[in-house]
UniProtKB/Swiss-Prot annotation:
Post-translational modification: Tyr-161 forms a radical intermediate that is referred to as redox-active TyrZ, YZ or Y-Z.
Keyword Nuclease: no
Reaction it catalyzes: 2 a plastoquinone + 4 hnu + 2 H2O = 2 a plastoquinol + O2
Function as written in the Swiss-Prot or TrEMBL entry: Photosystem II (PSII) is a light-driven water:plastoquinone oxidoreductase that uses light energy to abstract electrons from H(2)O, generating O(2) and a proton gradient subsequently used for ATP formation. It consists of a core antenna complex that captures photons, and an electron transfer chain that converts photonic excitation into a charge separation. The D1/D2 (PsbA/PsbD) reaction center heterodimer binds P680, the primary electron donor of PSII as well as several subsequent electron acceptors.
HAMAP family per UniProt: PSII_PsbA_D1 (MF_01379)
Location of the protein in the cell: Plastid, Chloroplast thylakoid membrane
Other known facts: 2 of the reaction center chlorophylls (ChlD1 and ChlD2) are entirely coordinated by water.
Membrane-spanning ranges: 29-46, 118-133, 142-156, 197-218, 274-288
Residues that coordinate or bind chlorophyll a PD1: 198
Family, similarity comment: Belongs to the reaction center PufL/M/PsbA/D family.
Stated name of the protein: Photosystem II protein D1
Gene: psbA
Length: 360
């Protein structure tokens, strides 16, 4: 009888735990995806902060010339970064237990893999958590669908691109100047500005900003007055009110006359779907462009495509871009310290201590 009661208590404890995990009454919803999201994001954040502040230099190029990225090794907030794993590691999985010592793991940039893989796992679980909460509240799943765009972009630069290039050392450094370094080198090696998917992505991001500004300004300009002239118009809105807070007919009429009639939405639902769709599709296409260039399916190359009747090249803008690409690629050449974002530190370590004896 006692054993039966213990089994019931155990089941009851598990049921209470499940109920707490999936409860929508908690201040912050946890969910089953949150069970994995919370530890992975906490791990990624903790290791990132520690590495950004105190990690020793990393042999990113695999040429025994470590590059310093942490604050304690001479960087500031702008130049600091978590340096990607060494080219000597390639795309091998490199957890702490695969290294001979902690010093070796740090020297080869192990923290970068740890941060990136935990971060990508965490944000993927965040997508699932958004879907899970929407499902339990009876909402549609579009919030989680929209968040797949930035997650796809992060996965492209942190995971897909290193896999395509054959080494995590080609991944984007976790820092401000490291991000710019990555962008310049990416342009030099892949001509991303001439990739149609990236161009569509730029249209998506800038277009989304424009549409957001247009929508916000139109709504703010056509608010239904519920307050006196001496009060802020914002006080005229009560959270949860059923009435419209702005006059969509006035906004539609204004914008239709400003541009032309069919440039303006007359359906609030389709308008907001469009506002969500435009930047999301743009960022999807940008992530797809990086993922294709990871395997060297690069941007268009129109270099020296215009010649005169004598066969002489007439330089076009494409040739100017090509010259800039060559300059950036040369400046980033391995073991040539003329690129200001590469902060080299420490003496080069000899690979062979003695020269081999050659007989004959």
């Amino acid at each position: 009888m006692t054993a039966t009661l213990q089994r019931r208590e155990s089941a009851s404890l598990w049921e209470r735990f499940c109920s707490w995990i999936t409860s929508t009454e908690n201040r912050l919803y946890i969910g089953w995806f949150g069970v994995l999201m919370i530890p992975t994001l906490l791990t990624a954040t903790s290791v990132f902060i520690i590495a950004f502040v105190a990690a020793p230099p990393v042999d990113i190029d695999g040429i025994r010339e470590p590059v310093a990225g942490s604050l304690l090794y001479g960087n500031n907030i702008i130049s600091g970064a978590v340096i990607p794993s060494s080219a000597a590691i390639g795309i091998h999985f490199y957890p702490i237990w695969e290294a001979a010592s902690l010093d070796e793991w740090l020297y080869n940039g192990g923290p970068y893999q740890l941060v990136v893989l935990h971060f990508l796992t965490g944000v993927a679980c965040y997508i699932g958590r958004e879907w899970e909460l929407s499902y339990r509240l009876g909402m549609r799943p579009w919030i989680s669908v929209a968040f797949t765009a930035p997650v796809a972009a992060a996965a492209a630069v942190f995971l897909v691109y290193p896999i395509g290039q054959g080494s995590f050392s080609d991944g984007m450094p976790l820092g401000i100047s490291g991000t710019f370094n990555f962008m310049l080198v990416f342009q030099a090696e892949h001509n991303i500005l001439m990739h149609p998917f990236h161009q569509l992505g730029v249209a998506g991001v800038f277009g989304g900003s424009l549409f957001s500004a247009m929508h916000g300004s139109l709504v703010t300009s056509s608010l239904i007055r519920e307050t006196s002239e001496n009060e802020s118009a914002n006080y005229g809105y009560k959270f949860g009110q059923e009435e419209e807070t702005y006059n969509i007919v006035a906004a539609h009429g204004y914008f239709g006359r400003l541009i032309f009639q069919y440039a303006s939405f007359n359906n609030s639902r389709s308008l907001h779907f469009f506002l969500g769709l435009w930047p999301v599709v743009g960022i999807w296409l940008t992530a797809l462009s990086v993922s294709t260039m990871a395997f060297n399916l690069n941007g268009f190359n129109f270099n020296q495509s215009v010649v005169d009747s004598q066969g002489r090249v007439i330089n076009t803008w494409a040739d100017i871009i090509n010259r800039a690409n060559l300059g950036m690629e040369v400046m980033h050449e391995r073991n040539a310290h003329n690129f200001p974002l590469d902060l080299a530190s420490g003496e080069s370590l000899p690979v062979a201590l003695t020269a081999p004896a050659v007989n004959g």
